[in-house]
Amino acid sequence: MKEEELLNLAQEAGFEAAVLPADRVPTDGKFRAFCEENRCGQYGANFSCPPTCGSPEQMRDKTLAKQTALVLKTTWPIANYQDTVAILHGKQTHNRKMLRLNESLGGLCAGGSCCCLCIPCRMKTGESCPYPDLRFSCMSAYCIDVAELCKRCGMTFAWDETLLSVYSMILL
């Protein structure tokens, strides 16, 4: 699919979007530390999260196995960064829109947060994942430097106390 077609599909789905060659997606193993801090509570408790999802090197290899990165962004109003209900809503809505878009693309998703196909993840109950081909890891699990990614594809990257920006990508 041509770049213009990808951008049009993404914009029709409600995303700000950009396209970048997959080998230009910046990764750095130091970003795995964000997962290891376990602020989201999913480290070792979600099939899509570290350490289960793979090492930083394995995640980089998944990125390099693809040709194109369709980078996606949505923004959501929040009261502040303690507004966990609005933040969760923004991230989950973004990820669901990403999955719907990917139904027609068949790519590999890196979400704005961890996989949300099952809440809670079946890993927490000792069951196997019912969606191994659909589950997705987050940008941090892929060790993506999102600020640099935005710079490379011309997107604005900024923190705002009252506006949540959620980033993801579909690798094709």
Which residues are covered by each model-predicted region?
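Auxiliary alpha/beta "docking" domains used to position bulky ligands
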Residues: 1-172
